[in-house]
């Protein structure tokens, strides 16, 4: 095992990123959003709020004709609450799909690697029965939240890197891929890839590159479990981002990384 790298010097910054979790779009009586908010409320570096104002959430089906309604409504809530991240939840049969929205997600440069279309699925049974989540799933959701944060100041970037390092240390001890049944595999591996990419994209380390690539490749190997082609496109897009980052921070083989970026962006 590789020795743990020292944590970035962020512990004294005392920066909390604000997360707003909406009540989930659900056709059964449950409190999914409230459950996730409760489970994330004690996480370091996050300030959690629960948003349960009633409004139609039909746009959460991710159909292209309603996508702009989703973006606009989310931006309105972000503006009202001053949140760094908005978490949506939507029931699909026996699963809950989580999506993560940030301010001006498709307008600003240097945003996080997380797309609004990136979907993390969790068993609906956990929220229906208000159960505590397995520790590995808890850590995965926490890592997804930290990865989603857009950071523009030096202090915020240091804090994000510090929190990512701590959650990766936890995830490396979890067996996240086996926490949920096989049907969740591509979504778990995609978010593990995003979390590691968010931390390591500017490290210039060949080993980190291979770790992240392997996570996304594993997600793609299980593409037969992906029902919506949008989700597969997200994975290829992140592979493109990985190669794109390598062209900037790993100067040994820029042409090869550049080709990899183009191929994966095209596939997405």
Model-identified regions with their sequence ranges:
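Short beta-strand->alpha-helix linker/helix-N-cap micro-motif
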Residues: 7-76, 86-97
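TPR/Sel1-like alpha-solenoid repeat signature
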Residues: 189-196, 215, 229-243, 257, ...
């Amino acid at each position: 095992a590789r020795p743990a790298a020292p944590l970035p010097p962020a512990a004294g910054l005392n920066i909390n990123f604000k997360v707003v979790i909406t009540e989930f779009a659900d056709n059964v009586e449950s409190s999914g959003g409230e459950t996730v908010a409760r489970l994330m409320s004690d996480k370091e570096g996050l300030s959690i709020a629960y948003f349960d104002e009633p409004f139609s959430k039909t746009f959460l089906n991710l159909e292209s004709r309603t996508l702009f309604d989703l973006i606009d409504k989310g931006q309105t809530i972000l503006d009202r609450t001053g949140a760094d991240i908005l978490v949506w939840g939507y029931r699909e049969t026996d699963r809950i799909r989580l999506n993560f929205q940030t301010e001006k997600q498709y307008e600003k440069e240097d945003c996080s690697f997380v797309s609004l279309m990136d979907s993390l699925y969790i068993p609906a049974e956990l929220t229906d029965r208000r159960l505590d989540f397995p520790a590995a799933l808890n850590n995965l959701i926490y890592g997804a939240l930290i990865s989603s944060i857009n950071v523009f100041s030096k202090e915020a970037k240091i804090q994000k890197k510090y929190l990512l390092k701590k959650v990766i240390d936890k995830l490396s001890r979890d067996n996240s891929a086996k926490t949920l049944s096989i049907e969740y595999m591509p979504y778990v591996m995609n978010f593990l890839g995003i979390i590691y990419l968010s931390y390591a994209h500017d490290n210039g380390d060949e080993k980190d590159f291979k770790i992240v690539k392997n996570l996304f490749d594993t997600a793609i190997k299980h593409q037969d479990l992906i029902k919506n082609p949008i989700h597969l496109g997200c994975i290829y897009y992140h592979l493109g981002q990985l190669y794109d980052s390598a062209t900037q921070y790993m100067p040994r083989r820029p042409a090869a990384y550049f080709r990899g970026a183009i191929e994966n962006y095209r596939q997405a």
